[in-house]
Amino acid sequence: MSAHQARKRFGQHFLTDESVVESIVRAIGPARDDRVVEIGPGLSALTRPLLDRIDHLTAVEIDRDLAARLRRQYPAERLTVVEADALTVDFAQFGQGLRVVGNLPYNISSPLLFHLMGAAEQVRDQHFMLQREVIDRMVAEPGSGDYSRLSVMLQARYRMEKLFDVAPEAFDPPPRVVSAVVRMAPLPADRLRPASDAAFETVVARAFSQRRKMLRRVLGDWAALTPWDELGIAPTARAEEVGVAQFIGLADALLAAGAPGLARP
């Protein structure tokens, strides 16, 4: 089979280090009857060992040449190939208890993580290879330089753990950044959740639009509607110092106060 040339427009960097593959599979710990979807299988570095351990795998691949290659390599009863951009795929269609894995294209990693939140009710867990700095932001605590809108939005929905780093030399071609692997498990139904997901998203986005400024100034006309003392948010606080629970409380309070521009559930 002829060699596949990595395509820059798809952000392709193929994992070639077998020890890293083994570490990822060990972290996933797949069981024979698990329902697993792999995003961006590429040259099957993870696909092969997964199929050694599970009965069936669904793979989402945007590159038509790689999709055709996968169909030639594996029988349809073992591997279902969905030839599509993962950003357009409704992952909820794959059923309950879903385990999502993959070496995500770094050029669309954040949009893809937000897209997958729409299927979180169906997901058991997610194991992804990503740019290390993205994972550092995902798991960052309030007050740290990495704490961001991404941190707040994902931590409101998932319990996340950074597992290990992966050097550029583990890939072909090697990326210009260090990668890492993260485990994401959706929080239970009884988690603290906002009254309106849309309002929560709007408030967090506005708060981090000028992260170095005091939150009171960034919120503008919403500031007068905010019960600062009740929320435990200091008058001089910046967005990067406010915890996830406080952001949920802030969004709920602004929604209840009729803050302009916030969508009701």
UniProtKB/Swiss-Prot annotation:
Record InterPro entries: KsgA/Erm (IPR001737), rRNA_Ade_diMease-like_C (IPR023165), rRNA_Ade_Mease_Trfase_CS (IPR020596), rRNA_Ade_methylase_Trfase_N (IPR020598), rRNA_adenine_dimethylase (IPR011530), SAM-dependent_MTases_sf (IPR029063)
Key word Transcription regulation present: no
Record keywords, A-Z: Cytoplasm, Methyltransferase, RNA-binding, rRNA processing, S-adenosyl-L-methionine, Transferase
Swiss-Prot/TrEMBL catalytic activity: adenosine(1518)/adenosine(1519) in 16S rRNA + 4 S-adenosyl-L-methionine = N(6)-dimethyladenosine(1518)/N(6)-dimethyladenosine(1519) in 16S rRNA + 4 S-adenosyl-L-homocysteine + 4 H(+)
Keyword Magnesium: no
GO cellular component: cytosol
CDD domains from the UniProt entry: AdoMet_MTases
Binding site for S-adenosyl-L-methionine: H13, L15, G40, E61, D85, N103
One Gene Ontology MF term: 16S rRNA (adenine(1518)-N(6)/adenine(1519)-N(6))-dimethyltransferase activity
Broad EC category: transferase
Gene3D superfamilies in the record: Ribosomal RNA adenine dimethylase-like, domain 2, Vaccinia Virus protein VP39
Localization (cell): Cytoplasm
Family under the similarity heading: Belongs to the class I-like SAM-binding methyltransferase superfamily. rRNA adenine N(6)-methyltransferase family. RsmA subfamily.
PANTHER family in the cross-refs: DIMETHYLADENOSINE TRANSFERASE, DIMETHYLADENOSINE TRANSFERASE-RELATED
Role summary: Specifically dimethylates two adjacent adenosines (A1518 and A1519) in the loop of a conserved hairpin near the 3'-end of 16S rRNA in the 30S particle. May play a critical role in biogenesis of 30S subunits.
Protein name per UniProt: Ribosomal RNA small subunit methyltransferase A
Species of origin: Bordetella bronchiseptica (strain ATCC BAA-588 / NCTC 13252 / RB50) (Alcaligenes bronchisepticus)
Gene: rsmA
